[in-house]
Design a protein with these regions (language model features):
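Charged, structured surface patches that assemble and position nucleic-acid processing machinery
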Residues: 2-54, 68, 72-146
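Active-site beta-strand termini and strand-to-loop segments that position acidic
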Residues: 56-63
Length: 146
């Protein structure tokens, strides 16, 4: 056997960034797959490039027009202060007008999840960490825009 419990039901895709390195950031992969489901192209930015700017570039399906640049942070904390800090880290890595996406792998899009996200976002905006758009992705593959 040797494949661990359960094995795989399907082949797991392996993504590479623009520098040819394997992408291991589960949050970036999750957000990219959601945009691919909507018909967009997702380009993973090179991790080892200090000037990379963002995790993902989302393009139209014809690969011509850039829709948006996104910096993704996966957040497992239930503390709004820690969430705002992670949002600030993401905002510090991107240009003005680019999008910050936060991914909650442990929360569904419920009142509890939205309240937690809104508290963290409100604190991040109050502290001046971020002025641009923020996307909140939940484990049930839904998104809220702030």
């Amino acid at each position: 056997m040797g494949r661990g419990r359960g094995g795989y039901t399907e082949k797991q895709p392996s993504y590479k960034d623009s520098g040819g390195h394997k992408v291991t950031d589960k949050g970036a992969i999750f957000v990219a797959e959601r945009y691919m489901d909507q018909g967009y192209e997702a380009v993973f930015r090179r991790r080892h490039d200090p000037d990379r700017g963002c995790d993902l570039t989302i393009k139209t399906s014809d690969d011509e027009n850039i829709v948006k640049n996104i910096e993704v942070k996966a957040i497992t904390s239930n503390n709004p202060s820690k969430i705002s800090t992670r949002i600030g880290e993401a905002a510090g890595q991107i240009s003005e007008g680019d999008t910050v996406a936060i991914f909650f792998p442990n929360h569904r899009n419920s009142q509890t999840g939205r309240t937690l996200a809104e508290a963290g976002i409100a604190e991040a905006r109050r502290k001046g960490y971020v002025k641009g758009p923020i996307e909140v992705w939940f484990s049930d593959k839904t998104c809220e825009h702030y």
